[in-house]
């Protein structure tokens, strides 16, 4: 009886572990820029052509974990050179649904925003975050295991 019980438990745990999917780790390789991109908010500069595009993001706010919908998708490209990291971001949304709120620096408020966190120690625990809202308010943060 005990042997059958252990066999059933083993089979159940095996099925449960197979049923759980491990999320795929997404990575975007930055491309070394041959020339400095023009910083004007218009992403038609030739330097961006052929650079890999990151898509299929997951929301943090207002619904954590919700996958983006095509009509409100975000596309990111990253370049770098000896002096800077350049990020191109295209955020698709109906203009009348973009939430803008003019607040002080380092205060995101309830506005729509985009941010990047660089895992500068490559340890998954420490990093530096840079954010900007739809109204142009900037926010930066340092993340660590100890707060």
Task: Report the location of each language-model feature.
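Sec-dependent signal peptide recognition
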Residues: 2-11
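N-terminal signal peptide c-region/cleavage motif recognized by signal peptidases
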Residues: 14-16
């Amino acid at each position: 009886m005990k042997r059958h019980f252990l066999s059933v438990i083993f089979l159940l745990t095996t099925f449960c572990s197979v049923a759980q999917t491990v999320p795929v780790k997404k990575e975007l390789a930055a491309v070394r820029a041959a020339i400095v991109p023009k910083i004007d908010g218009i992403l038609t500069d030739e330097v961006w052509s052929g650079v890999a595009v990151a898509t299929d993001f997951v929301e943090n706010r207002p619904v954590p974990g919700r996958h983006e919908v095509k009509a409100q998708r975000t596309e990111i490209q990253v370049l770098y050179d000896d002096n800077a990291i350049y990020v191109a971001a295209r955020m698709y949304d109906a203009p009348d649904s973009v939430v803008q709120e003019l607040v002080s620096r380092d205060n995101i408020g309830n506005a729509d925003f985009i941010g990047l966190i660089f895992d500068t120690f490559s340890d998954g625990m420490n990093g530096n975050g840079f954010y900007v809202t739809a109204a142009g308010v900037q926010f930066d943060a340092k993340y660590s295991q100890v707060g």
